[in-house]
């Protein structure tokens, strides 16, 4: 149990730190669509796709790795609450086009990158 807690704790801290760095670095480029949040969610979509395949195929991996990557790191990195407030801020300010654009970018982008991550992992594992 101790190692599970440590895996989640360390993963979450690293994921949250990366999300913060992405926001600091990218949000200033295009304020209408906070690119840091988008990048975190898209990267998280790709990594969860890879992880879903790897942890399904490589059943011998210690369970702490799954906790570290999926529960910890991706839990700290991705952010549905920030995405939600960014979409609703646009909507409440009457910027419905921006609200829909931000929502569509996050959802379609994340689904597409999750599929790409799964494809990447399957190709990588088949070649190994």
Swiss-Prot record:
UniProt main location, coarse: membrane
One of the protein's GO biological processes: cellular detoxification of fluoride
Activity regulation note: Na(+) is not transported, but it plays an essential structural role and its presence is essential for fluoride channel function.
Subcellular location: Cell inner membrane
Coiled-coil annotated residue ranges, if any: none
GO molecular function: fluoride channel activity; metal ion binding
Substrates-to-products reaction catalysed: fluoride(in) = fluoride(out)
Domain of life: Bacteria
Segments traversing the membrane: 2-22, 35-55, 67-87, 96-116
Transport is among the record's keywords: yes
Residues annotated as binding Na(+): 75, 78
Pfam families registered for this protein in UniProt: CRCB
GO cellular component: a single term: plasma membrane
Recorded family membership: Belongs to the fluoride channel Fluc/FEX (TC 1.A.43) family.
UniProt xrefs under PANTHER family: FLUORIDE EXPORT PROTEIN 1-RELATED
Role: Fluoride-specific ion channel. Important for reducing fluoride concentration in the cell, thus reducing its toxicity.
Name this polypeptide is given: Fluoride-specific ion channel FluC
Chain's gene name: fluC
